[in-house]
């Protein structure tokens, strides 16, 4: 029935899809003038009519049309067909079953659900300027795809598809993609290059090798494996291609962009393409109002130039976000877009050092842990599973037993390494992502000290969440990405879609206020003093990597959150003398740039000095806890290895641990003989009681198969129940038959109700020379015995 309905719907759509529309699908036709410019504007909240144009995106932007399929390397053609439409050369452009499944999902979910399509259908969809999400559009696309297959050759369709798909980083079409990522033509692409490009159209942002290298490498591996599975490449080619390096970010040639905020424009363009597709963004008549404030943008550049004066010295990136609505107000991704299009604000993932510690503290607060919890500030060894992680403080300075608040102000590595172990790296990753960090983060113990890769935009967004009293602000239009667009208008239809701010709670207001109160102390009396403003309170944190290769200051007021990174973009070069002959730390150049920018930015915004919400009194309760049975539990008075933790009243563990007086660990003795198991238990010391369980025929006896308890802890001297295999008393054990005559062996096995299988070998004639299973295992019905008997009769033996 479903296929019948699908066929009817398809037929109706086919009638409507007139042949005259086919020429309009040709990329050359589109490029010749069937396009409406898209325009990107800066924000102008005082007068929308005076919005400044940041960029104009035309249909031929970053696109070079190829005329013949022979201009594309055969391996590139194979790669894209393998991963996007393996039956491309077999079908007629439409998969009726696939359409039927998609229609059924649309009906079932009461909306339109995009599914997999053929290359022909994808090309038709890309070529359409109309991009509304309707069932009718789906059927119409399918009908046009079928018509296209009747008029065009497969090679022409594939070439048109490759000419129109978007590969990310401004590369529209296969020729521009080859030039952008590999500085060569589409005809020169190799297998690993082709596999990388073939994997990009599915999600150019997610699989971008300049921003998400691990995801990009996994996607390339998937394409290569698909080609191997389809017999397109050999195992040797697969291995060599997987080992090939990805293009480096600074090797990728991005299209030139003019205007006052080129790095920001490229970032916005990528977000729009992820939402609307390249066909609508380039030449689709979109008028996009962004969040960028050009006065703040110019100020950000000027602040960096004022502090970083040394030619050939380090570079800086700066991002400013209004915490109240999540809007990105300024973004400096480099000093010269002409020299390098690599965006330091969004693509440079560098270690944040101690500026990541507030995220660790935020994780603790979410678990109900109070900043009053105390740890010892001293060198510590953390068991990281595969190695011991030795943690020390900067310049060997320790402050003794201290709470989390003071440890933050003094940027104490030893304390925050212990806190990382306590709250757990996986929970820190969850908190970081919830705060707005989109970078991939590994849940290693070193995450607590900032040994992870993040970018300035991510860090600004996380701190903006702190500034907004624990609420991360996204937009309604572009999902959980940073809010860089105010609204999108269509010049074709007049439709206006606003990207309204939407707040998502991550921390409670109380938790965020506690964190902000602590970070204010960092600026007043800690490592961030150079960022202090004379007319208003500031909260923030410095960050410096061990080798002085990266330096950060991330801070905020209630009206603006700003991250500043300083370092050398092309290498992890130690900045040992760049601060007046001294090393560059987060409290030096980054803090100075931050202050230079904020002091003027807040005045230009006419932001009156505003105090943060006071942390107030938060009642706490100390609990003595222990890690037991996979969770923290309350000490019952007998637990070893406990610690005291201050929790917000009503939070923290409530279940009591089961610990014992004179507690010892119960060893695992399953699989051991009775004697060995008893000896292992006695060494603790623990006793043993034996419980016999029937052994299966053919299995060993006298071995422990179960114990109660299985691990855990008991008081010394307690008895552990051991379940030991015993033979069935009716049958006993299999006897040793080697050396017996065949007649005697059969008689003995007959008493056990066993009938052996006989094979012959060499040895003393007429005797058993080998038996299976061996003597000593449990006997019983159903046991398959095999005897190897030497040929001849015993009497024939000399």
Regions found by a protein language model. Give the residues of each.
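Short active-site loop at a secondary-structure junction
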Residues: 63-72, 314-315, 338-359, 371-377, ...
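Short, well-structured active-site flanking segments
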Residues: 89-99, 172-175, 234-237, 339-342, ...
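Ligand-recognition elements built from short beta-strands and adjacent flexible loops
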Residues: 608-798
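Active-site SXXK
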Residues: 78-81, 85, 222, 227, ...
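A penicillin-recognizing enzyme superfamily signal
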Residues: 290-311, 318-320, 331, 337-342, ...
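Mid-domain, small-residue-enriched loop/turn segments at the edges of structured enzyme/sensor domains
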Residues: 140, 388-392, 424-461, 476-481
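Conserved catalytic neighborhood of penicillin-recognizing serine enzymes
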Residues: 108-133, 252-260, 369-428, 468, ...
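Juxtamembrane regions of bacterial inner-membrane/periplasmic proteins
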Residues: 1-311, 328-329, 378, 418
